[in-house]
Amino acid sequence: MYSAVRTMNKKIVVIGGGAAGMMAALSAAEQGAQVTLLEPNERLGKKLNITGKGRCNVTNNTDIEGLLANIPRNGKFLYSAFNRFNSADAMNFFEKLGVPLKTERGNRVFPVSDSAFDISAALERRLKALKVQVIRDRASALKIEDGAVCGVVGERGRYSAEAVVLATGGVSYPATGSTGEGHRMAAEAGHTITPLQG
């Protein structure tokens, strides 16, 4: 996904099979990592599939400044991330996965099919092609030894890892599985959680 791809030989566990989790798993696998993706829902991308009224607004076809202008608070925080993977990169990524896109009013980008399922299905196909192991399990805790995260404890098993990516989402729309457990696990690992403001 990035122009400068490093080769890594690490065992990585990604917690969460939404858009962020799938993208993190793909990025790590494309760089040579052995990736396990933990997701408790029957399907990956459950919230992704209902975004944009089921159409999935993939990105906005604009430059970095245009993206940042639409972020209500502290958008500059995302500048380096958008500099590494911007709107054009996102559009190219999905078109290479076989999802034709269209730009509509307000520079909003959607699949030509108007179906969010096409986005999640394309991500799932790529995960499978890269041999990402998808396990239906709910992470309950991070395994921490000597102050370092070294794995994940799930309801059905334990998963060792050299790195763990928390991509569980927030607490919006709990019917999709967003319970905030990632925030709890991050806090238990010593991270500071800043409350979201409306």
Language-model segments: which ranges?
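Short beta-strand to alpha-helix junction loop
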Residues: 78-88, 105-125, 171-177
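Glycine-rich FAD pyrophosphate-binding loop
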Residues: 29-53
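Conserved dinucleotide-binding and phosphotransfer motif residues
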Residues: 31-33, 97, 130, 189
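N-terminal amphipathic/basic-hydrophobic helices that include classical n-h-c signal peptides
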Residues: 1-7
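Phosphate-coordination loops involved in phosphoryl transfer and adenosine-cofactor binding
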Residues: 9-11, 104, 161
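N-terminal Rossmann-like FAD-binding beta1-loop-alpha1 element of flavoenzymes
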Residues: 10-37
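Glycine-rich active-site loop/strand segments that organize a redox cofactor
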Residues: 55-103
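Predominantly flavin-linked oxidoreductase catalytic cores and closely associated redox partners
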Residues: 118, 122-198
